[in-house]
Amino acid sequence: MQMLRRRFIAFLSGASVLSLLPLAQAHTPYRQWKVMRERFLLVHSYRTDLQTDVLADRIVATFDALLPKAQARVARARDAERVGSLITTEQAMLAVMSRSDAIDLYNADNGFRGFDKHAIRAIGEKDGYVLISSDVFPEHHAWLVAAAVFDHANSAGKTLEEPGASLPIPLHQGASNYLQGLPLDALE
């Protein structure tokens, strides 16, 4: 009788541990990631092209100097496809990509097949790299970003330049408004 009771208790404890296993596997840091995206202005870059990281660091330094309340940070993804996925699914708002990767993402070509076509906008570019945003990035935020990156200059020159006419990605409306000289309060 004592032996059966021990087996039964062992069975119950094992069953209770196994019943909690799906909960342990379902844990994701999604809530923390959501809070991180809401609290900080994240500028995404990717590890397969370290120049994206260099430019993202410069952009964040500009934001720190001119838009300190944005609490800007660089978020590094493993590759351009991951950045494209985050931008086109509205999980990220800003990213630095090589010009060719940004064009491929905009057209859903090459490694970006199946991504939401035309879901990005350009804000600025520099030395073959483009600062892109999600097409849902608010206009007034894009205006502030454009004001910061176009007007801030240091020993390395301007942070970003206005995208050239040869870039097929449309300019974000907020950045366009800034470049046309419209004041921020005209947008709100």
Model-inferred region functions:
Residues 68-85:
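Short helix-initiation/N-cap motifs at beta->coil->alpha
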Residues 45, 122-141:
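A bilobed periplasmic-binding-protein/Venus flytrap-type ligand-binding module shared by bacterial periplasmic
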Residues 154-188:
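An extracytoplasmic/periplasmic, membrane-proximal ligand-sensing/linker region
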Residues 92-113:
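A ligand-binding cleft/hinge motif common to bilobed small-molecule-binding domains
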Residues 7-27:
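N-terminal export signals
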Residues 52-68:
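Short, polar/charged alpha-helical segment
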Residues 37-49:
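Short, well-ordered beta-strand elements
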Residues 109-125:
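Short beta-strand->loop
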